[in-house]
Amino acid sequence: MGGYLLDTNIVSELRKQRPHGGVVAWLESVADADLYLSAVTLGEIQAGIELTREQDPIKASEIESWLEMVADAYNVLPMDAATFRAWARLMHRKSDTLYEDAMIGATANVHGLTVVTRNLADFRALGLRVFNPFDAV
């Protein structure tokens, strides 16, 4: 397939009032058809929305509306059987703290994508191709 799988920290950066210039510039330089999200990223952000909802339901609704737009704007890849099997291979003898990263990484692995993240160390530990757009400026 080729292309890029955006990690949760990249998607979250886009929600900021002033997202990092390197992230914005890099995203603008890549064709939309080459940008992907894992369903896991949507789940991670939704989990954060639910925590926010306990303190500030209005803000949670705003973020949830934003997340709906994000989900519609990107190619979202599911956690299917092949991806879960790749996840199990990546997780073998690894720390349980890498669960979500390994699921995102498995999605990238199955689809031949580079993980775009600020969190290079954990994804490199899983043997994945990574790119950090925060360093692109």
Where are these regions (language model features)?
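Structural detector of well-ordered beta-strand residues that form the stable sheet scaffold
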Residues: 36-38, 116, 131
